[in-house]
Structures are given as structure tokens and as C-alpha cells.
Design a protein with these regions (language model features):
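Structural signal for hydrophobic packing residues in well-ordered secondary-structure cores
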Residues: 46, 50, 65-72, 76-79, ...
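Short, flexible turn/loop "capping" segments at secondary-structure junctions
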Residues: 14-19, 252-255, 286-291, 375-381, ...
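Rossmann-like NAD(P) dinucleotide-binding subdomain of oxidoreductase/dehydrogenase enzymes
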Residues: 112-275, 279, 301-304, 514
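N-terminal Rossmann-like NAD(P)+-binding subdomain of aldehyde/semialdehyde dehydrogenases
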Residues: 1-130
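Conserved C-terminal structural/oligomerization subdomain of aldehyde/semialdehyde dehydrogenase
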Residues: 21-24, 198-201, 222, 296-297, ...
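Residue-level signal for inorganic ion chemistry
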Residues: 20, 57, 79, 168, ...
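ALDH superfamily catalytic-core signature
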Residues: 189-193, 232-372, 399
Length: 516
């Protein structure tokens, strides 16, 4: 609980993302005993932390945000070296991360996360109804796995950690091996904020090393898992959690190709513009966004041919970029090779992939691959590449979309004249994705109350939640009901006097009124 430990003997080195050379930062792989100590520290902190008022927890989150804001230019330079991300992107991501913490602080002060429901007793009814009162409490210690592509917003102090801490759950972070020094700086900021706010020891913990995640997920003190990463990694954690003597939920955001459908009237009116905008979305951040449009669909026509040609030109004109690390580049190259080897797929545009940087690529696949259930097109290629598919008619387009797996997002690019003809695609896409876009691009994910960053498997392991936005807190809460409890023993959210001033559901009616 806040104590540093380096009992292991395996030294881990942070690497320069551009050169692959070791940076002057060394870390030690956590031992099994250290993983146990971290989980136990979180377990000890949980009873005290969850009983703190929402206002106290809100102050803690705001203190973390302020500490992140205070990290200087040296921190930005460090993140830049570990990830190859440009300074402006890092600064923007830091602001996003801090504001996300502040947004959850607002949620705590607002109080609706309590989900207060009261059905007052009716002793004169036959049979009598007991007095029943429900609210929600934190699940317990949460293991969080940092993501490679967002070293701040989806990592140590990112959305999963913010949501768990807001819910009253201590956190144990498994630092991502691609930005360990960044993780250490952020962890220090969190620990300083915890001390400033008077939080219990063990409210935040972090461990390093490959393989330690397995021990963390299996640990009996851990009550839930938050993960952002590959389908392989997320599925492995889900299987581990399900095999525990006491299974726990895993909220994993894993794989999505984010289909984008370009409708005929949009092609006719602004096909080249859409091609330029789409190329910008595909290559944003070197294509290392889980919301990158990885599959583009349209109806066979001269207009679609012209659009595909313009998209190829736009992608070919964009420069190669450095990826997050050598492993990410290697995975990108392997993904391109799988596409190139497939007889039903051909490369349309892009420089030959060579060297230390990733070149944008455009491929075209036969629609029959989707119709026949070929799994290759369902696999995300993490990097600046996308695949186009043309359907013969509306019926074939709908069938192709219907054969897609679950997605984080699905996009329609169209005009008013397209809406009547293609409105039937909307209920189909509603079954496939967590966020539907019209005339926009999915790479931007706003942090707000209404956002859903989730979707059916394999986009996530649980389609009922989101990892971005204030609804994310609900993943780490569970309902608790009190029957015929005396008012003095009830939490403030359920007391008759309603001291928190909450909007509560009382006997089927929403009200802020105190009860008699």
C-alpha cells in the first residue's frame, strides 16, 4: 500500500520507440509475493475507501487531475521517447485524462450513480410489503491493464482507473511494458494526490512485468478487471477470470474494424471530400486507434470506383509514421502480409512496407469473403491500413454487414436523399455496434455522459457497458438492498431525510422530497 518494492531479479528496460534503444530507466518484474502484496493492500483499503463520502472521493479524483496537469515538459518529452507520439498529442491526451477525472468527480457530487430506489413498507397490504431500499456500492479491488496506444487516457490514470476509483474500488494497475517510465510518473502523481487527500494506504497500487497479469486476475482479492488491448489478451483474461473458484467480471475492450458505409448520394455530391476525410481518419495517430475505420463498404458504381481511387491517392500521399514500438510495427507488418497472401484480397495503394515506420495502405476484398464467413476480414489490423468492399446491390450490402462481428462503432456517410432508401441499415447496425455515426468519423471519442465506447463481442467482453463516459462507473458497482432496516443504519442516500438531496425513485415516482 504505497511502499516501493523490487524483490525480483528480472530487470525490465524502457525503450526508445523510434530507435529501439534502451532508455536509462530500469524496472523490476514483480514477484508472485509482490503481486499478492499489492492485491492485499487494495483489499485492506477497500472497507475504508468505499465508505468515504462521494465528496471525499471526488476531491481525490480532482487532486489526481491537478497533479497530472502539473507534470512539466520533461514528462511530455519522456512520453514522446517511449511512444513516438507527438508532443501536441501527448499534451492533448493529458488534458483529456485530467478532465475525465474531473468529470467523474462531478458524477460523484451529482449523486445519481447511487441509483437510490425506495419502496416503502405497506404493513396493511395483504400480504404485507416490507420496506425495501436499494443503492449501489463498489465491487471491490479492481485490476486495470494499461493500453499501449493511449499511455495516459487508457492507462495508469485512465478511464478504467478513474471509473473504479469513483465507484469506491481501490485499483491495482498492471503497467504496460511499452511505457513503463510514463506509468511510473503517473503513479507517483496518483500517490501524491492520495496523500494530499487523506486516502487510505493501498487505494492505488502498480506492478510491472509480463506474466504478472495472470497472477493478478487469479488473486482472490481482485473483484473485477478492466482491460484495453488485443482480442487474444482480453480473451485470455476472461478465461482466467471465469476459471476462478469465484469468477469475476472482466470488462475488456478488444477488437473492432469499425465498418463505414458510403452511400450513393454522398459519393455523387462529395466523394473526393469523403475520401480525403477518411484518409485522415485512417492515418490519425498512425492508425493506432481502436476506432479506426478498418472496413469501407459501398455499392458497385462508377462513383464508388472514383471514390476508391481518390482514397488510394489520399492514403498514398500521406507520410509514413513511427508506431508506438517495434512490437506494434511488427504486428502491423504481419497483418499486411496476411492480407496480401489472401487470394480474395489485393493491395490498391501504399508504398511497400519497409523500414522503421508504418506506411499507409489500401486493400480491396471480394464481398464474398464476408458473405462466406472468412475470418480474415473480421480481424483488426492495428495501423494505417483499411480495406474496401463493393456490394452488388442493397440486399448484398445488408447481408455483408449482417455477417460482421460486434463493433465499437459503425458509420453511415450519406445525404438526405440516401436516408429513405437505406434506413433499413440502421436497425441492422444497432445490433452490431455500440456507437452509430452519421456523417462523422469514429476516431474521436468524446468524454461525456452520453458516450458509449463498447459493443458486442469481440469489440468488448460485455456489451452492457462502456469504457469511456460517465456510464463507465456502473461496471464497478453492484446493487445492494436493505429490507426493514432502521433509518439510523441506512446510508445517507437512503435515509428518510434525504440529506444528500438526491433525486430518488420513491414508490415509483422520482422525487427529491424527504420522507415522513
Amino acid at each position: 500500500g504505497g511502499a516501493r518494492s523490487a524483490a525480483g531479479n528480472l530487470i525490465l528496460r524502457s525503450l526508445d520507440a523510434d530507435s529501439g534503444e534502451a532508455l536509462p530507466y530500469a524496472f523490476v518484474q514483480a514477484t508472485e509475493a509482490e503481486v499478492d502484496a499489492a492485491a492485499r493492500a487494495a483489499e485492506r483499503a477497500y472497507p475504508h475507501y468505499r465508505q468515504l463520502s462521494a465528496t471525499r472521493r471526488a476531491g481525490f479524483l480532482e487532486a489526481i487531475a491537478s497533479r497530472l496537469d502539473a507534470l512539466g515538459d520533461d514528462f511530455v518529452a519522456l512520453v514522446r521517447r517511449e511512444t513516438a507520439l507527438p508532443a501536441a498529442r501527448i499534451q492533448g491526451e493529458r488534458t483529456r485524462t485530467a478532465n475525465q477525472l474531473r468529470l467523474f468527480a462531478e458524477v460523484l457530487r451529482r449523486g445519481d450513480f447511487h441509483g437510490a430506489r425506495i419502496d416503502r413498507g405497506q404493513p396493511g397490504r395483504t400480504p404485507p410489503r416490507p420496506d425495501l431500499r436499494q443503492w449501489r456500492i463498489g465491487l471491490g479491488p479492481v485490476a486495470v491493464f494499461g493500453a499501449s496506444n493511449f499511455p495516459l487516457a487508457f492507462s495508469t490514470a485512465g478511464g478504467d482507473s478513474a471509473a473504479a476509483l469513483a465507484a469506491g474500488c481501490p485499483v491495482v494497475v498492471k503497467a504496460h511494458g511499452g511505457h513503463m517510465a510514463t506509468a511510473e510518473c503517473v503513479a507517483d502523481a496518483i500517490l501524491q494526490a492520495a496523500a494530499d487527500s487523506g486516502m487510505p494506504a493501498g487505494v492505488f497500487n502498480m506492478v510491472y512485468g509480463s506474466g504478472v497479469g495472470e497472477a493478478l486476475v487469479r488473486h482472490p482479492a481482485i473483484r473485477a478487471v478492466g482491460f484495453t488491448g488485443s482480442l487474444k489478451g482480453g480473451r485470455a483474461l476472461c478465461d482466467l477470470a471465469a476459471a476462478r473458484p469465484q469468477p469475476i467480471p472482466v470488462f475488456a475492450e478488444m477488437s473492432s474494424i469499425n465498418p463505414l458505409v458510403v452511400l450513393p448520394e454522398a459519393l455523387r455530391r462529395r466523394g473526393r471530400q469523403v475520401a480525403e476525410e477518411l484518409a485522415a481518419s485512417v492515418t490519425l495517430g498512425c492508425g493506432q486507434f481502436c476506432t479506426k475505420p478498418g472496413l469501407v463498404l459501398g455499392l458497385r458504381s462508377p462513383g464508388f470506383d472514383a471514390f476508391v481511387a481518390a482514397l488510394g491517392e489520399a492514403l498514398a500521399a500521406r507520410p509514413a509514421q513511427s508506431m508506438l514500438n517495434a512490437g506494434t510495427l511488427r504486428s502491423y507488418v504481419e497483418g499486411l502480409q496476411r492480407l496480401e497472401r489472401h487470394p480474395g484480397i489485393r493491395r490498391l495503394a501504399g508504398a511497400p512496407q519497409e523500414g522503421r515506420q508504418a506506411h499507409p495502405q489500401l486493400f480491396k476484398a471480394d464481398v464474398g469473403l464476408l458473405l462466406e464467413g472468412d475470418e480474415l476480414l473480421q480481424e483488426e489490423v492495428f495501423g494505417p491500413a483499411t480495406v474496401v468492399i463493393e456490394a452488388a446491390d442493397e440486399e448484398q450490402l445488408a447481408r455483408a454487414l449482417d455477417n460482421l462481428h460486434g463493433q465499437l462503432s459503425a458509420t453511415l456517410i450519406g445525404e438526405a436523399d440516401d436516408l429513405a432508401a437505406f434506413a433499413g441499415l440502421v436497425p441492422l447496425l444497432e445490433r452490431k455496434a455500440g456507437r452509430l455515426l452519421f456523417n462523422g468519423y469514429p476516431t474521436g471519442v468524446e468524454v461525456c455522459d452520453a458516450m458509449v465506447h463498447g459493443g458486442p463481442y469481440p469489440a468488448t467482453s460485455d456489451a452492457r457497458g462502456t469504457s469511456v463516459g460517465t456510464l463507465a462507473i456502473e461496471r464497478f458497482l453492484r446493487p445492494l438492498c436493505y429490507q426493514d432496516y432502521p433509518d439510523s443504519l441506512l446510508p445517507d442516500a437512503l435515509k428518510n431525510a434525504n440529506p444528500l438531496g438526491l433525486l430518488r425513485l420513491v414508490d415509483g415516482r422520482s422525487t427529491r422530497e424527504a420522507l415522513d
